[in-house]
Regions:
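Intrinsically disordered, low-complexity N-terminal extensions of AAA+/P-loop NTPases
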Residues: 1-168
């Protein structure tokens, strides 16, 4: 990680990130820190993916971590699901558009393009598994805008007490 490189340059031992947490709220604190690192410290995509897997594995006893792992998503889809969940939990932002997750795939242009295209044409596993849905605005769907489904809010994020998109 960037902290590791900094520590090596300064001839210090790197500080390991403590990924063990007590509950889902703390897990999202850690997830938010990792996302911030990815964006601000130019953490490599694969290194970010590895850190996320370690976070989920270390906290497999939490229902959120086990639910997410049980979905069997490929890395690119899992990262986007977690990115979307973090947007909702951290910023109460339900709308997910490509510019929101462009930083996730920084340096991975082909992967980003594939994700945008799959979401737009409805072939994404996130849509097929009922995790993302097209955003509906006054009866019109927007092909570039998606939201987490009520299933994600009611089942996967249940420990956080987040209201489903249909509840206001």
């Amino acid at each position: 990680s960037a902290d590791t490189l900094k520590a090596i340059r300064q001839n210090e031992a790197p500080k390991p990130l403590d990924l063990k947490v007590a509950d889902t709220f703390e897990l999202f604190d850690q997830l938010n820190k990792l996302i911030h690192q990815r964006k601000s410290e130019n953490v490599d995509y694969q290194e970010f993916v590895d850190m996320i897997h370690e976070l989920l594995s270390t906290n497999a006893s939490l229902s959120f971590a086990s639910e997410v792992k049980s979905l069997g998503l490929k890395d690119a889809d899992l990262m986007l699901l977690l990115w979307g969940c973090n947007m909702l939990v951290s910023n109460n932002d339900r709308v997910i558009i490509p510019s929101d997750y462009e930083d996730l795939y920084e340096g991975e242009g082909l992967l980003f393009s594939r994700q945008v295209r799959a979401l737009k044409n409805g072939s994404s596993p996130l849509i097929e598994k009922g995790l993302f849905q097209l955003m509906d605005n006054d009866g019109r769907a927007h092909s570039d805008a998606h939201t987490l489904t009520s299933h994600v809010c009611e089942e996967i994020l249940k420990d956080l007490g987040i209201a489903s998109p249909t509840e206001k």
